[in-house]
């Protein structure tokens, strides 16, 4: 098959809402519904093919489906999510590959956010307003004044943020994003608003590790040309309306329908697609075409 529709694993983190269900058609009984892992081979939340096979099992038996550009990675390289932040996420940071492999036995996390919708006045935290010392960073975590030196950025639908590992960040309330990231689930929380988890205990913080890995400077500006984001792990583009492309021998293609509806054609197959759906086109499948009044996030390695 040249077109593989994926069903996500979902997460009920306490800051989630209901929009992934009501607005994006994600089928889940979880409440709240915080995340849908729409392209995932991660054991913490795999995506599934229509026959119930995990995407991880599929690529294990069809390694050629990944493409030659994936050969440099020891595992499936990326993970894509829908995220509905009904409340603020924790202020957090992700480690580099070197630090994460040494301390967590998995890869670090560089990621990008594409804002799908947000309430008026929405903002997020993205790095620092100015460079601070490690000592000041630790002290501000301790006395709950960290947000005074964080870079609060107003957001609007269609905005994109590239977040290299080591960047302190958080999505704040009222924002829905599509996130493309390295295939990792390592997060170090530095502040969580005093919230407690389902067990009634405060959620764990990881301050010492965060002090080790955080880049304590303003975020760098990135110019990706015509792409939303591009790095050694992924290249992401946003398409509106009809377009075509190709899944060549170098990489699989991930198509995430972020709005509207249409059709997807590849390898003699044609399927109807709509908002909230995720499709995997194996490497080497050749030309594909999307038609209709839809918006699509296209990711390759």
Protein language model features and the residues they cover:
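Short, basic/aromatic beta-hairpin or loop at an interaction surface
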Residues: 131-143, 249-263
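Functionally critical, mid-to-C-terminal surface segments that flank or help form catalytic/ligand
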Residues: 202-252
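Short acidic-glycine-tyrosine-enriched beta hairpin
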Residues: 150-162, 267-285
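Transition-metal
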Residues: 1-132, 187, 192-217, 236, ...
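An exposed, glycine/acidic-rich loop-and-rim segment of catalytic or binding clefts
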Residues: 141-149, 160-162, 168-218
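Hydrophobic, well-ordered secondary-structure elements that form the walls
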Residues: 239, 260, 276, 296
């Amino acid at each position: 098959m040249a077109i593989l529709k994926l069903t996500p694993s979902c997460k009920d983190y306490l800051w989630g809402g209901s929009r992934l269900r009501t607005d994006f058609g994600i089928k889940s009984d979880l409440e709240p519904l915080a995340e849908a892992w729409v392209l995932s081979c991660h054991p913490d939340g795999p995506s599934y093919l229509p026959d119930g096979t995990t995407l991880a099992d599929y690529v294990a038996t069809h390694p050629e489906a990944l493409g030659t550009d994936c050969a440099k990675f020891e595992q499936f390289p990326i993970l894509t999510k829908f995220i509905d932040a009904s409340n603020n996420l924790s202020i957090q940071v992700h480690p580099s590959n070197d630090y994460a492999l040494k301390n967590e036995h998995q890869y670090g996390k560089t990621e990008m956010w594409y804002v799908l919708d947000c309430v008026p006045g929405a903002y997020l935290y993205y790095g620092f307003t100015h460079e601070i010392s490690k000592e000041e960073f630790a002290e501000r975590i301790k006395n709950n004044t960290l947000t005074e030196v964080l870079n609060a950025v107003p957001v609007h639908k269609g905005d994109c943020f590239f977040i290299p590992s080591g960047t302190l960040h958080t999505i704040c309330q009222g924002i829905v994003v599509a996130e493309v990231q390295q295939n990792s689930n390592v997060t170090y929380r530095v502040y969580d608003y005093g919230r407690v988890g389902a067990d009634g205990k405060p959620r764990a913080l990881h301050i010492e590790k965060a002090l080790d890995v955080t880049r304590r400077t303003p975020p760098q500006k990135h110019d990706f040309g015509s792409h939303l984001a591009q790095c050694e792990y992924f290249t992401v583009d946003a398409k509106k309306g009809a377009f075509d492309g190709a899944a060549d021998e170098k990489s699989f293609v991930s198509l995430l329908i972020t709005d509207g509806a249409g059709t997807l054609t590849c390898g003699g197959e044609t399927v109807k697609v709509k908002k909230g759906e995720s499709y995997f086109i194996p490497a080497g499948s050749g030309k594909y075409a999307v038609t209709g009044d839809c918006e699509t996030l296209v990711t390759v390695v």
